[in-house]
């Protein structure tokens, strides 16, 4: 069973299928963003890389001062050791597979 994590407004939901633990340096998340939903993340540790695959509708991704629009069926990777935000500016739900790889020290 996967314990869903939801935003206060219930517009953003994360399903941590493979959460981070002491035996692995990655996690795999399934994310649902309702129309208008957004989620900001503080920088992860230096060298952390995120990989996103987008389904449903377009996702706006803000990394530092850069903005990207990822269309359904497309993917992107980025260094997540800076502030970043996901936003669904469409009128349909967006779903994302998110793989976060933490740099081994």
Kindly label every feature range from the protein language model.
Residues 10-13, 24, 71, 80-105:
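Ligand-binding loop in jelly-roll beta-barrel domains
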Residues 30-34, 44-61:
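Short, conserved beta-strand element in jelly-roll/cupin
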Residues 64-80:
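Short acidic-glycine-tyrosine-enriched beta hairpin
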Residues 3-42, 99-103:
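A short glycine-rich, His/Asp/Glu-containing loop-to-beta-strand
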Residues 41, 61-62, 68, 84-90:
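Short beta-strand His + acidic residue motifs that chelate non-heme Fe in jelly-roll/DSBH
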Residues 17, 57, 73-75:
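Short hydrophobic/aromatic patches on the structural cores and recognition surfaces of FHA
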Residues 12, 28, 49, 65, ...:
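Short coil/loop residues immediately preceding or within conserved phosphate-binding loops
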């Amino acid at each position: 069973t996967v314990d869903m994590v939801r935003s206060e407004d219930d517009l953003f939901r994360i399903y941590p299928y493979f959460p981070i633990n002491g035996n692995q340096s990655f996690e795999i998340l399934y994310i649902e963003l309702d129309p208008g939903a957004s989620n900001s993340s503080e920088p992860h540790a230096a060298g952390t890389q995120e990989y996103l695959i987008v389904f449903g509708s377009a996702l706006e991704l803000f990394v530092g001062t850069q903005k990207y629009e990822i269309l359904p069926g497309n993917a992107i990777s980025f260094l997540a050791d800076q502030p970043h935000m996901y936003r669904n500016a469409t009128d349909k739900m967006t779903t994302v597979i998110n793989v976060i790889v933490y740099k081994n020290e």
